[in-house]
């Protein structure tokens, strides 16, 4: 967005590590699959995955879906883009146990692009520095509280899961939380 003339300011970076992976079905390194069908989100958050795979000249076909995990589990694609705290857990929950060779972790291969930041327009930031700082500090304190009180945090999440009848369970939410918290640690 900055290149498009819309300057942004990052006021809080919660994730220090990339959660993005590509998972292949057949135990091979996803970057070696020629003419593979690769499932990805329709949201446009897959530019890094597309550029890494496309740069290898493998002729991959990108299949956009609202929920690419379903295509992967059904065997309709050879690989899928996933996040370690979400889709990778769902793949495992569906009974797949991907080998380490079949998971390309961007963070471990020179593409550790930080995710999950809080941004605002530069003009808003310049007019509201104190408010932005207070928001960032409160958000950080919230994450610190969650790290110190994971079961209480899960109680809160599960109350909303029950209220809004969301299809998940405490075990999945605990695994997601553990992964999200691990991504917040600086591994460098």
Each language-model region and where it sits:
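Secondary-structure end/capping motifs
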Residues: 127-188
């Amino acid at each position: 967005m900055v290149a498009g003339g819309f300057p942004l300011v990052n006021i809080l970076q919660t994730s220090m590590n990339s959660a993005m992976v590509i998972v292949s079905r057949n135990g091979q390194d996803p970057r070696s699959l020629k003419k593979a069908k690769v499932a990805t989100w329709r949201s446009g958050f897959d530019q890094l995955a597309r550029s890494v795979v496309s740069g290898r000249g493998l002729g991959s076909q990108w299949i956009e879906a609202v929920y690419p995990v379903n295509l992967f589990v059904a065997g309709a694609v050879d690989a899928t883009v996933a996040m370690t705290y979400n889709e990778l857990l769902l793949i495992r929950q569906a009974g797949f146990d991907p080998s380490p060779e079949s998971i390309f972790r961007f963070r471990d291969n020179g593409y550790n692009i930080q995710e999950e930041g809080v941004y605002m327009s530069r003009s808003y930031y310049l007019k509201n520095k104190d408010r932005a700082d207070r928001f960032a500090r409160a958000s950080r304190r919230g994450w610190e509280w969650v790290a110190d009180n994971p079961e209480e945090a899960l109680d809160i999440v599960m109350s909303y899961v029950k209220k809004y009848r969301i299809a998940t369970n405490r075990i999945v939410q605990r695994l997601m939380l553990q992964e999200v918290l691990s991504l917040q640690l600086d591994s460098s």
